[in-house]
C-alpha cells in the first residue's frame, strides 16, 4: 500500500512540476527562438541600450554607406523561404559570407566586413531565415539554415563568378556554417571559415544564457530543447557543432577567434571545439578583452590583422 502511495505522490509531484514549468519553457522558447511578429528581428539594432552593440551597428552602417556603389541587392528561394542579402563587389575572385548571430540582420554583419575587403574578398551579408526581410518563423539553431548557406554559396559561384567561398560566423552563425561545410551537398569551392564565439552545443550555451537571466534550469532548459524539436524537427542533442566539426574536410582552413572572458562560449568549451576540428590547417587566437560577439569592437587592430594575415598564408 505504501508503495502505491509513494508512487502516487511522486507522480503528482511530476505533474505539478510539469504544469508549473511548461508555461515558463514555452515563454522562453517563443521569446528567444521564434519570430512571433514581423517587427521582431527586423533590420534594426538588436540591443540599442548596449553601448558596444550600438557602436558596432553605427560603424557597420557607416562602412556600408561608404561602399554603397559596390552593392547589389540579391534574393534567393530555398526550402520554401524567400531570403534576402546584399553583395558587395570589390572586384575579387573570392567572397566571404558573413553569418550573423541570433536576433541579427544583415546590417549587423556590415561591421565584420572591413578586414575582408582589405584581405581581397567580395562580401555577402544576409538576412538569415526569419530575420530582417527574409521569411520564416522558427530558428533551427543553424541546422536547417545550413542549406540556405549552401544555396547562397552557389549563387556567389554561379552568378557572380567567385572562385572561392568562405564563411565568417558569429556565434550561432558559425553553427550554420559548420553544418553547411560538412554537408555532402556543400560545393568544393567552399574552402573554410572564420568563427567568433561558436558553441560546442546549443544546449550548453543556452544554459548559460538562462543562468544569466536567472531562469530555472530544471526542467525548463530541456523542455525548451524539446520544443525546438517539436516545432522545427531539430534534435539539439544530436545536431551539435562539436559533432559536425569532426567531419570537416582535411584540406579546409579554419580560424577560431575566442574571448577569454566569454561567458556563453567559455574557454574550456572553445578549446574542445578547436581540438575536435579535423581540418589540418587551423589556428586558435585568444583575445583578452571583450564579451561574447564583441571581440572586434574591443580589439579592432588585432582582430583585423589576424584575419588579413590568415588569408595571406
Language model features: what each stretch is:
Residues 8-76:
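An N-terminal hydrophobic leader/cap segment in hydrolases
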Amino acid at each position: 500500500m505504501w508503495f502505491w502511495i509513494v508512487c502516487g505522490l511522486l507522480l503528482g509531484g511530476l505533474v505539478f512540476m510539469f504544469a508549473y514549468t511548461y508555461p515558463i519553457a514555452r515563454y522562453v522558447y517563443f521569446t528567444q527562438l521564434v519570430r512571433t511578429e514581423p517587427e521582431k528581428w527586423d533590420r534594426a539594432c538588436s540591443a540599442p541600450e548596449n553601448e558596444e552593440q550600438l557602436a558596432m551597428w553605427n560603424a557597420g552602417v557607416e562602412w556600408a554607406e561608404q561602399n554603397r556603389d559596390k552593392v547589389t541587392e540579391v534574393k534567393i528561394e530555398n526550402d520554401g523561404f524567400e531570403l534576402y542579402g546584399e553583395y558587395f563587389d570589390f572586384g575579387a575572385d573570392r567572397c566571404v559570407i558573413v553569418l550573423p548571430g541570433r536576433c541579427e540582420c544583415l546590417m549587423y554583419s556590415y561591421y565584420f566586413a572591413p578586414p575582408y575587403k582589405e584581405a581581397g574578398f567580395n562580401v555577402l551579408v544576409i538576412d538569415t531565415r526569419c530575420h530582417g526581410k527574409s521569411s520564416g518563423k522558427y530558428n533551427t539553431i543553424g541546422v536547417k539554415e545550413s542549406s540556405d548557406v549552401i544555396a547562397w554559396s552557389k549563387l556567389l559561384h554561379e552568378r557572380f563568378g567567385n572562385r572561392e567561398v568562405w564563411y565568417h560566423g558569429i556565434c550561432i552563425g558559425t553553427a550554420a556554417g559548420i553544418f553547411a561545410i560538412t554537408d555532402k551537398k556543400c560545393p568544393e569551392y567552399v574552402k573554410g571559415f572564420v568563427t567568433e564565439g561558436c558553441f560546442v552545443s546549443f544546449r550548453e550555451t543556452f544554459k548559460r544564457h538562462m543562468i544569466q537571466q536567472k531562469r530555472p534550469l530544471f526542467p525548463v532548459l530541456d523542455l525548451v530543447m524539446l520544443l525546438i524539436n517539436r516545432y522545427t524537427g531539430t534534435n539539439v542533442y544530436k545536431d551539435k557543432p562539436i559533432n559536425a566539426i569532426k567531419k570537416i574536410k582535411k584540406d579546409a582552413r579554419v580560424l577560431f577567434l575566442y574571448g577569454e572572458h566569454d561567458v556563453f562560449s567559455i574557454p574550456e568549451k572553445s578549446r574542445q571545439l578547436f581540438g575536435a576540428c579535423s581540418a589540418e590547417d587551423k589556428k586558435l587566437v585568444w583575445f583578452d578583452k571583450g564579451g561574447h560577439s564583441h571581440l572586434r569592437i574591443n580589439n579592432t587592430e588585432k582582430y583585423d590583422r589576424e584575419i588579413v594575415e590568415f588569408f595571406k598564408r
